[in-house]
């Protein structure tokens, strides 16, 4: 889950803090502030969700650290990745956090772009999908350009129909 840390962000290991340039650079500018409006893309992609502090996924040092981890998993045999809460990581068209130069996490994480000379291993051989719950502020088409998506609206509609006994 690259987008958030545990509720107790002070328990983050020093190695991660050091890798990203310090604890203050690990989070978005409002990454320790609760999201109050999930229809606001800036809050949704940079704010604290459900008590979980929001990681500055646009920080190149974090991207490098994360990509090293993912490449280690690939070297161990992983051939696919599911991104939980993917809609909480910004897209290139989203508002830019004050601590970021650009929203390029998905370009790096899916192998379209290198970070600090490091690229995703075997990007064309991986299956990548993300939890992007459909809602008013979600840019499903843009996320779908990077990964397959969980069809949350379809699942909800199907469960509702089955529970109601309505099969039309």
What does each model-found stretch correspond to?
Residues 23, 51-53, 124-125, 145:
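Generic structural motif recognizing short loop/turn segments at the entrances and edges of beta-strands
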Residues 2-40, 96-102, 144-149:
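Aromatic- and acidic-residue-enriched segments that line the glycan-binding/catalytic groove
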Residues 3, 68-168:
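Active-site-proximal helices and loops of the catalytic beta/alpha 8
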Residues 17, 23-24, 33, 49, ...:
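Compositionally biased, intrinsically disordered low-complexity regions
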Residues 23-28, 40-42, 48, 75, ...:
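Surface-exposed charge patches in extracellular/virion surface proteins
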Residues 12, 18-19, 28, 44, ...:
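Generic detector of intrinsically disordered, low-complexity, polar/charged segments
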Residues 2-26, 55-81, 117:
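An active-site-proximal structural segment forming one wall of the substrate-binding cleft
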Residues 33-55:
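N-terminal small/glycine-rich loop or linker at the start of catalytic domains
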